[in-house]
């Protein structure tokens, strides 16, 4: 699998929404861009800039792909051109403490969250934030957005998630969940946005049903031996998780099933994972000074074929045997890719 060797530790990864370009932010305050081949994943450096001398922690790209936003340890917020890295705007001291997460909600709204739990909303056309929220008392770890209800959901190290109605002019959230008694580190929508999955510091995946509200989760999926720092949806029913133990696992949700390991950063914790515009390349960054691109296209093909096979149940023992061998395909592949760490199932 293609790896991009870096000179310093990366903290975030992002893909261009329209072109084969991947970005990463580094410990040194740099933001780097590479073009890659859609088929092979082979990369070539496009540009590298250093907007800040302090750690560049978080990246997010506007939906049109023209600009990428960066926040970090300095508390400042930067807008850069995705074409050449040139700075289009700097908001000095946008937060009073380090920015931990940046999220482009839509073309007219960007959310940022800092180490103290403060959330700010920004209009790209204005210099100052348009609203500030302070319902959390520990760092903001992740954001996701549900467009049907115009709801921005934030997770925090304080054990709560909160929901913000972006249409409201009030600086108070729509709701704050009950204390989950664990750090909430990552979130992603599943099932076409009907539900959400949240990763925690103790290695638990919690399932949240939007129809039942955001007060508490409705189900829990144990099994990860370490914290779940990053999540991405591969299909409406299948997610990939990046964990503190360096492994990227694939999990089916409802019904719950651990499918295997698709990549590993050895013993280094996975900081972030992202999926590219074609759902082929999974980008991941860790403390190993490497941006890894993993081809996950076959997983989608297997999922589609499995769905068809479930609809047409096998009539013979021979057909059942073939299906069983096919289901074991990703498990075998996973063991091969993570042979230095042992199989995924042995770790649980």
From Swiss-Prot:
State its location(s): Nucleus, Nucleolus
Q: Where is this region: Disordered?
A: 299-348
Query: Per its UniProt record, what Gene3D superfamilies does this chain match?
Result: YVTN repeat-like/Quinoprotein amine dehydrogenase (2.130.10.10)
Database matches in SUPFAM superfamilies: WD40 repeat-like
Q: Which Pfam families match?
A: WDR55 (PF24796)
User: Compositionally biased, Acidic residues: which spans?
Assistant: 299-318
- Decide whether keyword Repressor is in the record: no
GO cellular component terms, A-Z: nucleolus
WD repeats located where? 5-44, 51-90, 94-132, 135-174, 179-218, 223-261, 264-304
**Chief place where the protein resides:** nucleus
Q: Which family does it belong to?
A: Belongs to the WD repeat WDR55 family.
What is the protein name given in its UniProt record?
A: WD repeat-containing protein JIP5
Q: Which organism is it from?
A: Cryptococcus neoformans var. neoformans serotype D (strain JEC21 / ATCC MYA-565)
Biological classification of the source = Eukaryota, Fungi, Dikarya, Basidiomycota, Agaricomycotina
The primary gene name is: JIP5
């Amino acid at each position: 699998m293609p790896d991009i060797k870096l000179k310093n530790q990366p903290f975030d990864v992002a893909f261009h929404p329209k072109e084969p370009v991947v970005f990463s932010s580094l410990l040194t305050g740099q933001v780097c861009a590479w073009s890659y081949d859609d088929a092979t994943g082979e990369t070539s450096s496009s540009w590298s800039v250093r907007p800040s001398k302090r750690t560049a922690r978080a990246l997010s790209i506007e939906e049109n792909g023209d600009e990428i936003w960066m926040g970090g340890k300095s508390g400042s917020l930067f807008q850069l051109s995705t074409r050449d890295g040139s700075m289009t705007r700097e908001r000095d001291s946008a937060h009073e403490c380090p920015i931990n997460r940046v999220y482009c909600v839509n073309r007219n709204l960007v959310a940022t969250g800092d180490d103290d739990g403060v959330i700010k909303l920004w209009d790209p056309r204005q210099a100052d934030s348009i609203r500030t929220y302070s319902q959390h008392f520990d760092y903001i770890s992740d954001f996701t957005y549900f467009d049907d209800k115009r709801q921005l959901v934030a997770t925090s190290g304080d054990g709560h998630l909160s929901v913000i109605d972006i249409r409201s002019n009030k600086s108070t959230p729509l709701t704050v969940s009950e204390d989950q008694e664990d750090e909430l580190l990552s979130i992603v929508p599943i099932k076409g946005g009907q539900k959400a999955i949240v990763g925690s510091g103790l290695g638990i995946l919690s399932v949240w049903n939007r129809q039942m509200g955001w007060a508490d989760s409705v189900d829990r999926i144990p099994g990860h031996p370490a914290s779940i720092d990053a999540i991405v949806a591969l299909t409406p029913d299948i997610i990939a998780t990046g964990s503190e133990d360096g492994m990227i696992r694939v999990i089916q949700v409802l019904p719950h099933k651990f499918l295997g390991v698709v990549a590993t950063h050895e013993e280094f914790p996975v900081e972030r994972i992202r999926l590219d515009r074609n759902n082929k390349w999974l980008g991941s960054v860790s403390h190993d000074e490497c941006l890894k691109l993993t081809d996950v296209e076959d997983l989608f093909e297997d999922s589609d074929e499995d769905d068809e096979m479930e609809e047409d149940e096998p009539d013979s023992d021979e057909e059942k045997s073939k299906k069983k061998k096919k289901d074991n395909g990703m498990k075998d592949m996973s063991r091969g890719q993570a042979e230095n760490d042992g199989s995924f199932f042995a770790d649980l």
